[in-house]
């Protein structure tokens, strides 16, 4: 069979061929590893941000997590990064696979006789596990095998590879990497690692085209999406997914019940296990890395939703609830879950066990229906682990702030610590058009408490299908939430990024501030609205305060005038009485113990010196010299005492 994965790739000529800021550069980490008797050189992407010098000396570059770029032309697709790794394990086989039919692309494709724009780029043999084999990263981890995927992840996360293997083996983290999506760069989802974000894209019956969805994919990953879900429900579902997979450097997730429903012309009661199973295999063969399966929506749970304000708001959940009621039978997803596990184990597809009964309003948060489903999901998680299949668990939804953390607690208790993946949650229902904000508040809160991945919400939530600009807004908003949680949890490198920004801000290094921003374009555009000239990029003020009222400039002047004396006072005072009495931390991020700070007496002494100087924020050179001499005399006298 012919593998055309490395043919015809080229650097794109559009905006995706450039870094998001001139100070950014692609700076990969390289490592040579041995795996299954073969040697591989890993090249793990990172962005290096060059910084200008400070008045006190040079600044080290800041390195941040990224996906690889620039990418190939979208009509040709990406190279198969993992193809050789998969082949080296010698536990997969190529086979013909199911024959694609036009109904896979929907009824309109059947009428046209073809999809609207067939994929003509790179193609590969379809792979599956050999008879009796399991090819999941969890299986390898449980056998004590460290794969190139695990090595790659460890370099990305700046951690020991054994930590990665142990977390995957225990089910507390997943590496979603279908063997038929070798273009994807290994990444890990788990509470012990950096918080990840997912971006949803996909067409609907009334809007969007294949090219638009591919552009959304590239745009989302450019701005930092760690995974992308294709939630297409309109035309050309199969072909749209093929274009997306062949161009995606990140894992792709789907909700296969959407496509299965299209195959029965949108009539939920006409769904069958056979149609759903065929759809799942179709998507496994294409390379989908994780699938949302609403197997926790069971017939006995549906009546629990009748008293809700907003009922069942999950599309997948409502489809399965409708099927259960129409047939008065248990869900075919729940009944056939073990067969799904067997299928997923052949391709290394991860479960994203869907919260089909999640609350759609804060009035319905944490009710019996939601938690009955979550407990069932816990049961299914442990069943999937028996097949070495990776699992993450989906969570709400709409939850007021005071009720958020119990969701983490119940998920950890019932689901054995499997990664939690939540949609927000939105913490209030009153802000249509701003639900990226209402949800980002809940997202930061729940991630701080242990959630591993956050599904973004765009400004169009509840209002319409997001466009390209909405996708970027959603991604950046959720990068803020994820990073804030990482800072709170103390993940390596998280605080250093903030510190670099704070230092650049205090030193008025405007270009560095833009470069260190999650969205450099917007940061610079806002600055330049009022101060567009290049000299303003070195000015020690912005348009908010102007030159006379900039607090940071005033602080710098104080340091210039009193810096040596302040340092000496900090070095000689060991009592920290005021700080200790108040139970406050000392200077810096360490505890009070062992940290020098100003005592109450020292503070009064410095305040008196400030008053003696005429309570002036600014002193000329002679005045500053006179004050410094007085301070030195008093310090000497204090030392003699």
Curated annotation (Swiss-Prot):
Catalytic activity: 5-amino-1-(5-phospho-beta-D-ribosyl)imidazole + S-adenosyl-L-methionine = 4-amino-2-methyl-5-(phosphooxymethyl)pyrimidine + CO + 5'-deoxyadenosine + formate + L-methionine + 3 H(+)
Binding locations of substrate: 200, 229, 258, 294, 314-316, 355-358, 394, 421
Gene3D superfamilies linked to this entry: 6.10.250.620, Radical SAM ThiC family, central domain
Annotated Gene Ontology cellular component terms: cytosol
Region span, Disordered: 1-25
Recorded metabolic or biological pathway in which this protein acts: Cofactor biosynthesis; thiamine diphosphate biosynthesis
Cofactor note (record): Binds 1 [4Fe-4S] cluster per subunit. The cluster is coordinated with 3 cysteines and an exchangeable S-adenosyl-L-methionine.
Binding-site residues, [4Fe-4S] cluster: 542, 545, 550
Composition bias type Polar residues, residue spans: 1-12
NCBIfam families per record: PRK09284.1, PRK13352.1, thiC
Protein name: Phosphomethylpyrimidine synthase
Gene behind the chain: thiC
């Amino acid at each position: 069979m012919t593998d055309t994965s490395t043919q015809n790739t080229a650097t794109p000529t559009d905006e995706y061929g450039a870094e998001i800021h001139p100070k950014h550069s692609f700076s990969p980490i390289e490592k040579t590893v041995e795996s299954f008797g073969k040697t591989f050189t890993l090249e793990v992407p990172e962005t290096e941000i060059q910084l200008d010098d400070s008045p006190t000396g040079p600044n080290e570059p800041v390195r941040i997590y990224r996906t690889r770029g620039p990418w190939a032309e979208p009509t040709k697709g990406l190279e198969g990064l993992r193809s050789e790794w998969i082949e080296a394990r010698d536990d997969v086989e190529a086979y013909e696979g199911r024959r694609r039919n036009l109904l896979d692309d929907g009824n309109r494709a059947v009428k046209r006789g073809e999809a609207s724009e067939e994929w003509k780029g790179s193609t590969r043999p379809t792979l599956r596990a050999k008879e009796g084999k399991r090819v999941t990263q969890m299986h390898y981890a449980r056998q004590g095998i460290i794969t190139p995927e695990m090595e790659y992840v460890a370099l990305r996360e700046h951690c020991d590879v054994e930590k990665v293997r142990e977390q995957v083996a225990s089910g507390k983290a997943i590496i979603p990497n279908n063997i038929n999506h070798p273009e994807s760069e290994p990444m890990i989802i788990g509470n012990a690692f950096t918080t990840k974000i997912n971006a949803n894209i996909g067409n609907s019956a009334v809007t969007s085209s294949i090219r638009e969805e591919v552009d959304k994919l590239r745009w989302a990953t450019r701005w930092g999406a760690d995974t992308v879900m294709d939630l297409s429900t309109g035309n050309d579902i199969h072909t749209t997914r093929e274009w997306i997979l062949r161009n995606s450097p990140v894992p792709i997730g789907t909700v296969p019940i959407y496509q299965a429903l299209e195959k029965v012309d949108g009539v939920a009661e006409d769904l069958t296990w056979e149609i759903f199973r065929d759809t799942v295999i179709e998507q496994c063969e294409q390379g989908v890395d994780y699938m949302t399966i609403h197997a926790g929506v069971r017939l006995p749970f549906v009546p629990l939703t009748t008293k809700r304000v907003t009922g069942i708001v999950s599309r997948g959940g409502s489809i399965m609830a409708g099927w259960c009621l129409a047939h008065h039978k248990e869900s075919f997803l729940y009944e056939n879950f073990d067969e799904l596990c067997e299928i997923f184990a052949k391709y290394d597809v991860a479960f994203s066990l869907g919260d089909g009964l999640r609350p759609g309003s804060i009035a319905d948060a944490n009710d019996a229906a939601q938690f009955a489903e979550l407990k069932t999901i816990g049961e299914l998680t442990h069943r999937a682990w028996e097949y070495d299949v990776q699992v993450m668990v989906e969570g709400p939804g709409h939850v007021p702030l005071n009720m958020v953390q119990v969701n983490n607690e119940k998920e950890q208790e019932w689901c054995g610590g499997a990664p939690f993946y939540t949609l927000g949650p939105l913490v209030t229902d009153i802000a249509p058009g701003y639900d990226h904000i209402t949800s980002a508040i809940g997202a930061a809160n729940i991630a701080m408490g242990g959630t591993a991945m956050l599904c973004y919400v765009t400004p169009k939530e509840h209002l319409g299908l997001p466009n390209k600009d909405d996708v970027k807004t959603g991604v950046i908003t959720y990068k803020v939430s994820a990073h804030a949680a990482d800072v709170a949890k103390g993940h390596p490198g998280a605080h250093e990024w903030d510190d670099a920004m704070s230092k650049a801000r205090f030193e008025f290094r405007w270009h560095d501030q833009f470069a260190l921003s999650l969205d450099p374009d917007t940061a610079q555009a806002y600055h330049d609205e009022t101060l567009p000239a290049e000299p303003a990029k070195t000015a020690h003020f912005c348009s908010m305060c102007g030159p006379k009222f900039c607090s940071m400039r005033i602080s710098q002047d104080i340091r210039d005038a009193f810096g040596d004396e302040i340092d000496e006072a900090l070095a000689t005072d060991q009592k920290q009485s005021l700080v200790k009495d108040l139970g406050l931390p000392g200077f810096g991020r360490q505890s009070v113990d062992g940290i020098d700070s100003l005592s109450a007496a020292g503070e009064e002494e410095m305040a008196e010196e400030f008053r003696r100087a005429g309570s002036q924020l600014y002193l000329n050179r002679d005045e500053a010299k006179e004050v410094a001499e007085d301070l030195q005399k008093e310090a000497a006298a204090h030392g003699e005492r």
